[in-house]
Amino acid sequence: MEMEHINENTIRVLIGNEDLADRGITFLDLLGNHKDVENFFYSILEEVDVEDEFQGSEAVTFQVLPKNDGLELFISKNVAMDDLSSLEGLSEVNADVSELIRKQIEADKAAADELDEMEATDETNRNVIFELDNFEAMIQLSKEVFMQSVLTNLYTYNDRYYLQVLFLTDELEKTNVDNEIAQILEFAHKTTVTQDTLVEYGTCIMERSALELTRYYFND
């Protein structure tokens, strides 16, 4: 595991696959429960002996980028939307990092409003749950099916993967929804598992944009 300071507010940690294996964690795990993953991130801070630099910070953000031999972890403190220009120096590592951070911070701020919108429009929207044989099926689905006016959540439950698709039917014709469901069923199956069951007993590992996230992180 290697660490370097990008600037006074951001460090980059290179974590190899062997490092992840030693901790019993995979990249997919890092897309799961925020509280559990945060503990992992802070343990990394302790290991690279810079945790004191981040103590007392009002905001600490963790951004993960996959690599063939592991992942890059960017840890930033006190990053405000207006200060993201200071991250432009990351372009030599990955030209899209600063924009990715910006989008993820914006997504976090919009999450509560978006979930409220889902609940408020539930009666008019069409909510469908699909079961996937494995995560590889999810990857293939993300590569072949492109949809607009949908929200997608990916859950694990009883060692299976479930994709929840909320079709915003006020923006989609019923025929379009039926066609998109037919496309999804080429990679998934119908299921009797309900949203309530997944929320109560399952684990949401990708929220709101599961197809887009899978396509971004697992695009060969």
Swiss-Prot record:
InterPro entries to which the protein is assigned, alphabetical: MecA_C_sf, Neg-reg_MecA
Gene Ontology MF terms: protein-macromolecule adaptor activity
Function per UniProt: Enables the recognition and targeting of unfolded and aggregated proteins to the ClpC protease or to other proteins involved in proteolysis.
Domain notes: The N-terminal domain probably binds unfolded/aggregated proteins; the C-terminal domain interacts with ClpC.
Subunit annotation: Homodimer.
Family: Belongs to the MecA family.
Protein name: Adapter protein MecA
Species the sequence originates in: Enterococcus faecalis (strain ATCC 700802 / V583)
